[in-house]
Structure formats: C-alpha cells, structure tokens
Amino acid sequence: MHLATFTDGSIPPCCVGEPTSASMNNTIHIKDAWNNQELKDIRKALINDEPVFNCSQCYRDEQCGVNSHRKQSNDFYYRMYKDDIDRALDNVQDDGTMLIDPFTLDIRAGNTCNLKCIMCRPNESSKWFNDAKKILDVTGNDVVRRDWNNKININTQNFAWVEREEFWEDFKELVPTLKEIIFGGGEPFLSKSINNLIKYMVDTGHSSHIKIRFHTNGTTIPESFWELVDEFKEIELLFSIDGFDQQNYYVRNPAEWEPIVKNLYLADKTKANAMILFSVHSLSAYNIVDLYKWRMSQPFKRLNNIPIVLGRVYHPDYLNPQGLPQVVKDKIHTRIMNFIDEHKNNYPNGYFDSLEENANWIMDSSKDNLDALVDYIESLDKVRTTSFDETFPEYSEIINNARQ
C-alpha cells in the first residue's frame, strides 16, 4: 500500500526504515520501483510475520518498551484504511509482487532546503555542504571527524531524480487512486514540482479524495498555498520546531521566528491540521519545556489542543540523548516530569503521555558521547558565529558541570 523515498532517491520500507538497494536513480518508473525484488522480499517476510532488517530500529525500540513507529503506523493506518489494506493483501502474489498501485506515498523530494539543522547533513539539506567542510577543518574530535567525513561524501547526481519529468508524470498517473501523500525534504515548499503537483490535483478534481501531510520548517510557505487548503480532503502541516525563538534559530539555523509564528497562526485559522514536530536530541531535550510554555501562552484556537509530536534522534550517536551522562539525563527527566505534574490537570488524560514516554526513553542506557557532543557544539559555534552558552545558558551550565 505504501511507497517511500529518501532525498537521494533510495527506497526504504518507511520513513524511519533502513533503505533498500532500490533507488529512483536507477529505475525509470515508479511502478518498476514498486515491485523491485527487495520490496517484494520485504512484503513476503512481513506477511509471514518474519523480521526484516530494514525495520531494526523499531524492533530495538520495542525491546525498550517504546511504542515504535512501526506499531503506531500499523495501528493508525489499519484503522484509517482497513478495507484498502485488506484489498492490498488479497493482491499480493506468492513472490511478493503487488498487483495494485500504492495508495499512500511518502516522498522526500530532494535536499533543497533553506536551513541547516544540526541533526541534518548535506543529504537532507543543500545548505549544509559549506558548513560541513568547515566543521571538518575545525573539529578536534575523531568521532565528529569520522561522522562528517561520511556525511560530506555525497554524489549530487543522486538528487537528479526529482528533476526528471518521467517521475512526476508517473506520479500524476497514481493520483486518481491515491489516498494520502506525505511530502518532506529538504523543504517541500521550495519544490516547484510539488507546488505544480498540488495545483494539478486541484485542477483535475482529485484533491477532494487526497490527504496531504507536509513536513515543513514553517519559514517559506507561499501565500498561494493557503487558498488551496479547502480543496483537499485533509491537509496536515507538521511544523518542525526545536525550541522557542533563538533556541530554534540555533538548532534549525538560521530559522527566523517571525515567519514561523505567522504561518502557525495562518494554519490555525484554516481547516488544515497544524502540529508542531519536535526532534528530541541532545541539544533540544532539556528545552522542550520552553516551547510548550510558549505555545500555551499563545491564543491558538486549535493548535494548543494537539500535543506536540515528538520524533527521536538516534544518529549520530553524539546527538542521541541517551548518550548523555546520567547526571544530565536526570536533570532533563526531572525538568520534564515537573512540567507535566504542574500542567497535567489542565489538559485531557493522555495529553502528555508521549512527552513522559520520551523522558523515560532518554533515561535508557547508552554509550557516553559527551566529548563528541561538546566538540560538535564548539565547532558549530566557530563556523556559524553562534553561542551555545548564550542561547542555552541553563542547559550549558549543566553540561559544563558534567564535564568536571
């Protein structure tokens, strides 16, 4: 039922899975990729309830007692599309060939982006390449150097697939039977092809049966988009925000706060379902409370009714918050739990469940990566003339004390 791509055209089973060897760069048509041998083998394994290597991260989460992306998606999509999924299962041949087209797509359409978020790399953002070279010049840590030597080693031709007319023509052929599309990037609103496809779906009348979810940094949504929201069955906007104001500027550099807030309010006034997506990593975890407090202080009509969506950062290891020293993790956990205790009676039961689950997830043991993290922070500050100490004074003090 589902076909996903990463920015470089590689094809995973889903957005958090390990990529297969299949790629939009070595196939001409979407339907060829859809029944690639590796995807057929994955289908056979899943139908037979056999483990799949590409799903390893979710299996590890489940062993830690975490409600994994795999389980959440299985539950959610089966509730949403039970009849369609049952029909898809009836149309899988013994060799894994799927006889019907995908009806949900997750397309990360290239790496074109206007930001250079600290947990991204050139593969996810075209803006990262110059900073990546500079970090290699200033880092004094072998872990950071190895990490960025790997990240900077990309083939820019791997992003050419999003410029191929054949891909977007194939996409249009799927539109009549599509039910849901996820657009990420890069920054999807910078893609002319995506903007043209949105208009095509409206002009052909197919927008009425399609739900679209955008993963956006919220800085560059065109004014014309808001005029089309009502044309679709549903629009979801996941605003990737990792802190309040200057905190977000530091993490999602150089994201200005004013256009993000403006677009949050514009979304709140439409029928679009707007949510904030917060990436939980070593630099952001302590300050998620600040973003919650800011949002609570704002007179949003609908946005405050929806818990902040939390995404975990596992790689690189030095950005995985589980790799922080125990004393730092204790501080993070205490701050989050105190915040929940202070506010839980003002919100429905379950509103803070995900926040509490992530606070507990951080406490799980992992290798101490503080030296690499501190070197990465210092390297970023040198390259970008930013200041971690000034942006995160309280958290900076906690980290510095942990080093002594």
Q: Where are the regions that the model predicts?
A:
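Extended amphipathic secondary-structure runs
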Residues: E163-Y200, V383-E390, R403-Q404
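A generic structured-segment signal
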Residues: K31-D32, I42-K44, C117, R121, ...
